[in-house]
Amino acid sequence: MAKHYVYIVKCKDNSLYTGYTTNVEARIATHNAGKGAKYTKTRRPVVLVYQEMFSSKSEAMRREYEIKTFSRQQKLKMIEER
């Protein structure tokens, strides 16, 4: 069964980007190749700072949506406590 991940990367400009994937390593490589999300294209390189694993896509997508509503400070606290 496929694993589903929500991840946060720290961009070159120190901003945070939250995303969903089934392969974290490949997705980070895609972001760093400039072929990922439009947001990260001009903010490379990106560094993985957080990830959570889920057994279903729907769980992961719900969590991604939740994290995207968090303030920067909430995300930083979550990263720090991981």
Swiss-Prot record:
Superkingdom of origin organism? Bacteria
Q: Which InterPro entries match?
A: GIY-YIG_endonuc, GIY-YIG_endonuc_sf, UPF0213_domain
Q: Which SMART domains match?
A: GIYc (SM00465)
Signal peptide from the UniProt entry = none
Using the record's annotation, list all stretches that form the GIY-YIG domain: 2-77
Q: Which PANTHER family match?
A: UPF0213 PROTEIN YHBQ
Family membership: Belongs to the UPF0213 family.
Provide the protein name.
UPF0213 protein SH2523
